[in-house]
Amino acid sequence: VFAALLALLAPCSVVAQQAREDADALSARIDGPPAPIAPAVINRDDGGNATVRAIRLTAPIELDGRLDEAIYQEVLPISGFIQVLPGDGDPATEKTEAWITFDENSIYVGARMWDSAPESEWIANEMRRDIGQLRNNDNFGVAFDTYYDRRNGVFFYINPVGGHSEFQYT
């Protein structure tokens, strides 16, 4: 089991986007499902798009990669992931569970990834930060659609040996 915990935007200032007067017009332009209603953590549409809900933390978590805090037992994980390579859009061949949580200062992504292959067969040999080659390793990534337009945002990913990268996409 490969477990990862990414602390994103720490420390950060949280600024809400300007509210739009015409919410109906905005929702008509969004290609995908609305945010899930608690206790659900993911909402999918027939087109394969997904929207997830972040959980507000009521107790601190430790960034140790163990994912043993109560939140990971109390909140359903995000699951049902899809592949990018190989088989873009195919269901994941291995089990993956993820949680997105936040507090006043940070957003946290915790994930457990299982692999039926022994560790010696993992494709994870890149440790240089922010190198494109890292995408050719086994990895876990998360994209934040910060404008909720399915076109612009930031992407973070990590491999089993700790190599990591982030980039902005438009």
Residue map of PLM features:
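Structural preference for beta-rich elements and adjacent junctions enriched in aromatics
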Residues: 16-170
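Bacterial N-terminal signal peptides
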Residues: 1-13
